[in-house]
Swiss-Prot record:
This is 3-hydroxyacyl-[acyl-carrier-protein] dehydratase FabZ. InterPro entries: FabA_FabZ, FabZ, HotDog_dom_sf. It comes from Syntrophobacter fumaroxidans (strain DSM 10017 / MPOB). The lineage of its organism: Bacteria, Pseudomonadati, Thermodesulfobacteriota, Syntrophobacteria, Syntrophobacterales. The gene is fabZ. One of its GO terms (cellular component) is cytoplasm. It holds the Pfam family FabA. Its EC number is 4.2.1.59.
Length: 147
């Protein structure tokens, strides 16, 4: 799935869209890609002279990739937000630097209606750099919330 299709699912835009491509997608799993470049705005201050992608943004990239998976499983997702509800078992294993390709792998552990619990792992060159369990839910469309 290319960036145009991803943007059809996610409301995020530059500089906060953190998934560039979907490499694999099934009804239970997704694999995404984030090309990490020196042009990322966060590298200006994190850290000058030794740029490292902030761990919370690795988690956000995982969450966005999981959002694409969730939205593909809901037929009437248009106009509905996805809310990040929580994270557990978060671990950062290695730094992510400019030039890295971040591979984002998520698998549904549990689904109850519009709520999803997913295992999430991020890799660089087949080495685990971060992992977590993420919880998210698809909310009501704005028109439904205003009614």
């Amino acid at each position: 799935m290319d960036i145009a299709k991803i943007m059809g699912y996610l409301p995020h835009r530059y500089p906060f869209l953190l998934v560039d491509r979907i490499l694999e997608l099934t009804s239970e799993e997704i694999v995404g890609l984030k090309n990490v470049t020196i042009n990322e705005p966060f590298f200006q201050g994190h850290f000058p002279g030794e740029p490292i992608m902030p761990g919370v943004l690795i988690i956000e990239a995982l969450a966005q990739t999981g959002g694409v998976l969730a939205f593909t499983l809901v037929s009437d997702f248009r106009g509905k937000p996805i809310y990040f509800m929580g994270m557990d078992k978060v671990r950062f294993r290695k730094p992510v630097r400019p030039g890295d390709q971040l591979i984002l792998k998520l698998k549904i552990l549990k689904r109850r209606g519009p709520t999803f619990k997913m295992s999430a792992e991020a890799f660089v060159e087949e080495q685990l750099v971060a992992e977590a369990e993420l919880l998210a839910t698809i909310g009501a469309a704005k028109s439904e919330r205003e009614a």
